[in-house]
Amino acid sequence: MKKCSRRSNASGKSSITNNSSSNSSVSLVTTTTTTTTTSNATIALNDSTGTKSTKWLVDKVRGVNLGSLFIIEPWMVPDTWESFGCTGYTSERACNEVLGLDTLQSKYEHHWNTFYSQGDFYEMKKRGLNTVRIPLPYWTVESTIRDDEPFARGSMKYVRQTVGWAKNAGLQVILDLHALPGRQTTESFGGDTTTLLVSFFSDSNYARAYEVLKNWTTLAHTDPAFSSVVAIEPVNEPKQGIQPGLLNVFYPQAQKVIRDTEKSLGVTCGGSGKKCLTIQYMSSSWGSGDPSSHIDADDNVAYDDHLYTQWIVDESQRTRQGYLDFLCKTDRMTSMNGPTIAGEWSLSTIGGGELETWSDGALSFFQKFAAAQIHAGEKGAGWIFWSWKTELQSNTWDYQRAVKAGYIPSDLSRIDTSVCDGY
């Protein structure tokens, strides 16, 4: 969903449609061979015959995003943003251009180094989570930053620290290219709100993104700290609608760059004993086209659906029952011919009244809402909550606060698995 709308909890925009129910089960597993989408089928990225070899280690992804760690979204971390002197600016570039990196560089480095700690990752593991998705900007690879782009340097040192913490805790990692050269969005998560122009969709900016993907792929296979990385997502939430070259140029070439890089390192997806990365694309439900139309969809590909119920359902469905009805009936997670992860979702609501966290019966509703979200995600390959932590007093965007509030059980084995019975 559009993240400035998401962040302010105001109404958002979406071209995504509501789909009907399905009983299909989609897994990321290491011992299953089925590769087609049928009722009650399991779609695998790995099999026991040795014909494929990937880095996935879990059956169902249960994870959290590390939002606002390497790309600050001001709505999520208002205290940090104020400490930067950036209050009122809506993106990193907007503030950087005015205050300058001479002032801000050390503040970014302090944030990268301290917003998370090793203890966060041990706590994630304790809560039954197995995956972290790390939203990253292209400027982690400094050679791709143009002279006129005022973004802080030096973040890769801290990315390495972060993936190492995940590795130490036994968590697998998805590297998500969240902010792309030239902007794939005008929202704050793209790092640049200084213009309404979206300029990513060009050969020159694609080339910079390919350089990032090559760098990350190399690190995933050569740097021990990055051995926890199991997947790369080449673009997060591109501008909706059919964008020039996204489907027929960028998507297949991104796949080729990753696979060619792996091949040069002696890593293949076919029986070598080496473990290739999964490549994850936004699903067609996002509204920017069907990525499977121009890629090799059998080449260890997965899809990402951002299951923000509050912006997907019609206004008439913005009730407690409407939210649960949608989640229990939707087949969004099984509509692609491949494993689909709900790569972002939250417990945020739109509609007021009975949907407010302070309304009568709120605890019972939000427990059911969380269980239904998890149910919907696990119809597919799993789910990743947005986000593990914020600086908000919000139980709906912050996984830790949601657990403390009783919305999500501290032990995921206690989630209500009967929430969708009868649908």
Q: What name fits each language-model region?
A:
Residues 1-15:
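C-terminal membrane-anchoring module of eukaryotic surface/secreted proteins
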Residues 21, 26-129:
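N-terminal carbohydrate-binding accessory modules
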Residues 62, 334-420:
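Substrate-binding cleft of secreted/luminal carbohydrate-active enzymes
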Residues 62-66, 132-134, 173-177, 230-232, ...:
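Hydrophobic faces of well-ordered beta-strands that scaffold small-molecule active sites
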Residues 74-89, 150-153, 182-200:
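Aromatic- and acidic-residue-enriched segments that line the glycan-binding/catalytic groove
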Residues 110-132, 147-179, 190-231, 257:
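An active-site-proximal structural segment forming one wall of the substrate-binding cleft
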Residues 140-144, 181-191, 349-353:
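Short acidic/His/Gly/Ser-rich catalytic and metal-binding motifs that mark active-site loops
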Residues 224, 228-231, 235-374:
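Extracellular glycoside hydrolase catalytic/binding regions
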